[in-house]
């Protein structure tokens, strides 16, 4: 399929060919939802740690003898039913990862790229770089590109471009192989350079 490719610095545009099998597929909401949930679950870290009765300090001695006191039998002051005792079913070391097959991941990438293009949130651009790594140049370039809240997906990330844009909080820069469906949906717009569009077409087409 033919789309317009923008040269941000000059404002000129030209037609290029992109893979119809990637950027022209129908929307599959169920697949995209499943893969995005799996990708975000994989980013979770199980930091919460709770102690069971064995991990709580103390409680090695039997509080009172088994029989003859009239009280309920007890073997440890760290029993889960005691105040200050351990948890019966402590949390910690959870594994939140979900399995995503390669074909599912590829299908979700095709779906999100095609839908962003249909919505006008994906723009193909020519690969550019700055003469020097300056945030001032980055700000001017962003204003020509349509403002921030944007993800730049590049075939190869130019160093000066990366250094000139990294200070802006709502601007993401990534290589084409480092982005997933959740990353593409995180920003208002996606700028995809020509090389990245070609590589995505080869891999997911």
Curated annotation (Swiss-Prot):
Protein name: Large ribosomal subunit protein uL4
Ranges that cross the membrane: none
One of the protein's GO biological processes: translation
Family annotation (InterPro entries): Ribosomal_uL4 (IPR002136), Ribosomal_uL4-like (IPR013005), Ribosomal_uL4_dom_sf (IPR023574)
Region Disordered: start-end pairs: 53-77
Pfam families to which the protein is assigned, alphabetical: Ribosomal_L4
NCBIfam families xref list: rplD_bact
Gene3D superfamilies named among the record's database cross-references: 3.40.1370.10
Basic residues compositional bias, start-end: 59-70
GO molecular function: rRNA binding; structural constituent of ribosome
Family to which the UniProt record says this protein belongs: Belongs to the universal ribosomal protein uL4 family.
Subunit structure: Part of the 50S ribosomal subunit.
Purpose: One of the primary rRNA binding proteins, this protein initially binds near the 5'-end of the 23S rRNA. It is important during the early stages of 50S assembly. It makes multiple contacts with different domains of the 23S rRNA in the assembled 50S subunit and ribosome.
Coiled-coil region list: none
Keywords in alphabetical order: Ribonucleoprotein, Ribosomal protein, RNA-binding, rRNA-binding
GO cellular component, one term: ribosome
């Amino acid at each position: 399929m033919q789309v317009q490719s923008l040269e941000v610095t000059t404002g000129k545009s030209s037609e290029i060919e992109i893979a119809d099998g990637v950027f022209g597929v129908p929307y599959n909401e169920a697949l995209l939802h499943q893969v995005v949930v799996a990708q975000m679950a994989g980013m979770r870290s199980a930091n919460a740690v709770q102690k069971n009765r064995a991990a709580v300090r103390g409680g090695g001695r039997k509080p009172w003898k088994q029989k003859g006191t009239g009280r309920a039998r007890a073997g440890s002051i760290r029993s889960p039913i005691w105040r200050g005792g351990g948890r019966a079913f402590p949390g910690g070391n959870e594994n939140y990862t979900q399995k995503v097959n390669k074909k599912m991941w590829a299908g979700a990438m095709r779906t999100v790229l095609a839908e962003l293009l249909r919505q006008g949130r994906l723009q193909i651009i020519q690969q550019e770089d700055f003469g020097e790594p300056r945030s001032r140049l980055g700000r001017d370039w962003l204003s020509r590109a349509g403002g921030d809240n944007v993800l730049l997906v590049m075939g190869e990330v130019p160093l000066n471009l990366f250094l000139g844009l990294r200070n802006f909080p709502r601007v993401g820069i990534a290589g084409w192989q480092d982005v997933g469906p959740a990353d593409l949906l995180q920003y208002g717009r996606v700028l995809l350079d020509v090389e990245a569009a070609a590589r995505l077409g080869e891999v997911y087409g």
